[in-house]
């Protein structure tokens, strides 16, 4: 994790390209152990995709990403200024959603106004 000091941040236009752009952005800037890297990149991609699908917004609006080193791991936050998170939706085979975040992160949560979903991944692989 030594290619950045304590935090990274970026914004991506709310288009179908945003999840891929966020994955490439993080991979290019954070040297993470393989197991941690894969989990963090997949979780980030899913949350950015959720912003694209569910925020009710489109480009030129943006989704914001922040990554912070914390003792023993990483804290990642994805923010959009969309409609917020309501009741959970039924499982759909083509959408992993917050269930994926719940199973693959070590801790996670959300707040609305603006919509802010965060997760933490500990330094070792899960």
Which residues does each predicted region cover?
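Conserved short strand/loop->alpha-helix "switch" segment adjacent to the catalytic nucleotide/phosphoryl-transfer site
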Residues: 21-45
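STAS-typified acidic loop motif
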Residues: 7-19
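Histidine-centered phosphotransfer motif of kinases
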Residues: 39-57
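Residue-level detection of beta-strand scaffold positions
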Residues: 19, 23, 120-122
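Conserved beta-strand-loop-beta-strand hairpin that lines the nucleotide-binding pocket
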Residues: 1-9, 52-126
